[in-house]
Amino acid sequence: MNFLHYNPKHISAFDAEVHHGKNAHKLINIFTLLITLSFFIAAPLGVWYAAETDFWANLYRILTSPSKLVTDYFALGGLGSTFFNAAICGLASNMIMLLSRAQAKATTFAGYMLVVAHCFYGLNFVNMWPTILGVLLFCKILKKSFRENLHIALFSTALGPFISDFAFRYTITDTFDATNPQITVLGVIFALLFGIAAGFVVPALLPGTTAMHRGFNMYKAGLAIGILGIFIYSFMYKSLGINAPEVVDIVNPEYYALKYGYRGFVNIYLIILFTMAIIMGFIYNRNSFRGYKELLKSVSYGVDFLDKFGMSVCLINFGVYGFCILAYLNTVFVLPEIFGFLPQGVGFTGPTLGVVFAALTFSADGQQPRTIFPIVLGYGLLFAVVCGICGVMDIRVPWSLSNQGYINGLAFSTGLCAFSGKYGWKVGTLAGFLSAIICTSTSEMHGGFVLYNGGFTAGLTALVLLPILDYYKVKPKFEDDTH
């Protein structure tokens, strides 16, 4: 897998060798390794930029704290230590991909992206392992291929907050002191047994929940793991009368004084990353954007971009779509400054940077700017309706699009883009609208312990919208995967 000797002349957006052969597999491995490398480079730069002191103490605090939604690792640890956590988790994922000798696919890329995405708010190098071990044992005992279930192993890390709570708080006390974390043998046993058990349940749930939403929620693991999380939370906490932890808060006045978080650093980092993706895709696509126009015509339903267009075109899509996300975030963050009646939201926090990666998860498997736009429009429509009602009732507007819950919700609601692609922009807007209504309420169902809450929300939205479309015989406008 030598980047310097990987000949872009052998790559074509419509070349079967790219689509199905080793080249696409290699390009996924190369690009994910480059993302991991970018985290390693950003870590010391982040320490310098934020004047972060006690780097190792900050990293230790990230690794040993309960991490339910939404735990901002920039606040809990620091800018550099958070990037380093993402780097070592990303490297671990790279090593699993390489050692398993799996032929990397779009789902493998998605699994990697969701791992590194949540390393900024809830997933760390400690709590990622038990469920991966569980899936590995599931494959060994049931004689299934781990290579074919690699993406499920990576998806299962969404249950990481349960692992951290069981290990560091659940068996000790109702409260948690981030400055003095404790661990017990019983807690470790709980965490390991839970991870192993989850490894046997998640692979069994995924096919059934996918059938429920018929593939209209790209974050299909979100619905499966969200439902599982409800049962776990209800039994382990509600039924047993054990209090769930609060979101870990720590005194960090320098960070909280930043109006827009680490806006400058994160913008520069993402601009470099997205530019690199576009250039890399352009070069490996025979110095052209050939195929990207056709990708943008896709309905985003039942189409594997990697298989149809090649990874080089998917890299171009990654970069272009990423710039669209970045433009949206920079816009909504300044809206409260322009319109004084809007409540101030957040900025480029750890969760915000994390969901940028989460929103790009399926950029090789269905997500693209054209079909995403109606989903974004749906969020804007709900906000406009709320502002209108509040104006008529003469009450304060309670939230803005820059609130963390709505930023996170929208990132995962983009997984509903198949609705706009298949049924048209109006249905896509409705899907975004419905998802926005519930996006800040669903985490209470599982106690905030499921990191893929946005995918869970999108899944519930699909479960409501699909039977309505069926009942009123709303016909898909576009049957083919391109139009």
Where do the language-model regions lie?
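Hydrophobic alpha-helical bundle architecture
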Residues: 98-99, 116-124, 135-149, 153, ...
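N-terminal signal-anchor module of multipass membrane proteins
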Residues: 2-123, 277-288, 310-315, 323-329, ...
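C-terminal transmembrane helix pair
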Residues: 191-209, 220, 402-476
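Membrane-interface capping segments at transmembrane-helix boundaries
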Residues: 282-293, 468-482
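Membrane-interface helix-loop-helix junctions at boundaries between adjacent transmembrane segments
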Residues: 18-26, 144, 160-267, 442-457
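Transmembrane helical segments that form the transport core of multi-pass membrane transport proteins
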Residues: 104-106, 288-390
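Structural signature of hydrophobic alpha-helical transmembrane segments
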Residues: 75-87, 119-129, 183-197, 267-271, ...
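Short, structured motif recognition centered on aromatic/hydrophobic residues
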Residues: 92, 107-118, 129-139, 152-157, ...
